[in-house]
Amino acid sequence: MSSSSDTHAGESRHRRNPIRWLLGFGFFVQGFRGFPWLGANFFLTEQLRVNPSVLQLLQNSANLPMVAKPIYGVVSDSVYFFGQHRIPYIAVGALLQAISWLAIAFLSRSNVSILALSIYLLLSNLGASLVEVANDAIVAESGKQKTSETQSGELPSFVWMVSSLGGILGNLLGGIAIKTFSAQSTFLVFGILALLQFLVTINIREKSLNLPENPSPAGGIRKHLSDLSHVLRKPEISYSIAWIAVSTAVVPVLTGTMFFYQTKFLKIDASLLGISKVFGQIAMLLWGFAYNRWLKAMRPRKLLTAIQVTIAFFVISDLLFVKGVYRDLGVSDSVYVLFFSGFLETLFYFKILPFTVLMARLCPPGCEGSLMAFVMSAIALAFIVSGYLGIVLASFVGVTEDDFSGFTRGLAIEACCVGIPLILTSWIYDEAETKEKSKKIE
């Protein structure tokens, strides 16, 4: 009877706990950010008429606030407002996004400068960073609770799938909105959605989330920095983070060039490009489901290696696409872009889910926000470096707004770079291998 009573009580608390509502809505909004960003890409190319290198430079520079995530994480772990240290940061982040996108929506009707637009995009990503840090910390903290759900990685898979759902709707509706109305309409809609997230968040109290009690924040920021430094000195954590960062940073992606190639050279319609990104987000959604259902017990090193190999194959596929091989086989450019182009863009992010689950498992209590923020910061910095290297590569192979003759050479170099991290997979922590070594020593 006692066991049954405890079970019913636990289920009752789970139903009352708004954590899934908070995280579900929060991750949905973050996934939906593809909606205004698709509009921003078309606004930059069609109205501000930037070239491929400038477009990719702006895309990656706007992500610079993501690099400071460890600072936000440490502050979130140690600085409380009214006894709360997660909810306030989500609220502030949502408000910053609302302000920035609404400002862009109204300013873009006049002759807004690239500088002004860049500042607002930076402000938007600062807000997004705060939200992501707090949300990731809540997911990691919940993972410390001894329930079958969190131990199995169900909550990380849930928020991953919700974020993917937001991405699906964002890109689908983004392409339609740009074609039917204008790129500016996407800024207005997302600004209103972010404002709604702010209003929802401020009405939730952190105590209702039933998060595990953390050690006292009395030590302040200095103590949390010391704790983070101690955690990062653990080889299983530091080497794993180094691999995920290197596996992304060494690959010079040509996203800006590909966007120009598809829209300016191939004349791919905005709505088709939006639907292409939808297929990519659907793949993300299915990946979250597949990971939770079949792959969560798989050794992280083996899974991350398989993903890296898959990325290499799809970059080679893009190379064949640009060379016209698929066109010669009867597959039109529109069909390839629709089904494969968006998938490759999201494939680079597939590594994040199993990696964050691994980090949450290795992270000691009380340092979740700081460590997860550091991890996401390292990944964000790696993507920025990857984007900047892509700009250098595009210049090296001679790709311009009107000349794509060197594009295939650039993609060939990119494919070779994707293979480099496969040499370093021993850096990824493998619990089974560690246990085997311990037994041999004994």
Swiss-Prot record:
Keyword Transport: yes
Entries under InterPro entries matching the protein: BT1 (IPR039309), MFS_trans_sf (IPR036259)
Assigned keywords, A-Z: Membrane, Transmembrane, Transmembrane helix, Transport
Coiled coil regions in record: none
Statement: the UniProt record of this protein carries the keyword S-adenosyl-L-methionine: no
CC terms in the record's Gene Ontology section: membrane
Location in or out of the cell: Membrane
Pfam families: BT1 (PF03092)
Top-rank lineage group of the source organism: Eukaryota
Annotated TM spans: 23-43, 64-82, 87-107, 114-134, 158-178, 184-204, 241-261, 270-290, 302-322, 335-355, 379-399, 410-430
Membrane topology reported for the UniProt record: Multi-pass membrane protein
UniProt similarity note: Belongs to the major facilitator superfamily. Folate-biopterin transporter (TC 2.A.71) family.
Function as written in the Swiss-Prot or TrEMBL entry: Could mediate folate transport.
Name of the protein this chain belongs to: Probable folate-biopterin transporter 7
